[in-house]
């Protein structure tokens, strides 16, 4: 059976931690920044964990857990 291909667009947006959690970066931080406070912009810099309902779908896109 051939190897499964990693979807490169997903590999750029998500990464898998050592414990297996899938992390994503938050949106809304690069457009219309003038209207947002510094505190809100700092919160957008933090990584978030992917929701459980989306986890299985993302695992199919990055089968080898690309970091």
Curated annotation (Swiss-Prot):
Keywords: Ribonucleoprotein, Ribosomal protein. One of its GO terms (biological process) is translation. It comes from the Bacteria. GO terms for cellular component: cytosolic large ribosomal subunit. GO terms for molecular function: structural constituent of ribosome. It holds the Pfam family Ribosomal_L35p. The keyword 4Fe-4S does not apply. Belongs to the bacterial ribosomal protein bL35 family. PANTHER family: 54S RIBOSOMAL PROTEIN BL35M, LARGE RIBOSOMAL SUBUNIT PROTEIN BL35M. This is Large ribosomal subunit protein bL35. It comes from Dehalococcoides mccartyi (strain ATCC BAA-2100 / JCM 16839 / KCTC 5957 / BAV1). The gene is rpmI.
């Amino acid at each position: 059976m051939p190897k499964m291909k990693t979807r490169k667009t997903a590999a750029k947006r998500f990464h898998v931690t050592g414990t297996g959690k899938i992390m994503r970066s938050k949106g809304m931080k690069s457009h219309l920044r003038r209207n947002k406070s510094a505190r809100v912009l700092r919160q957008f810099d933090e990584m978030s964990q992917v929701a459980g309902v989306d986890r299985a779908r993302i695992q199919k896109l990055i089968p080898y857990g690309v970091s």
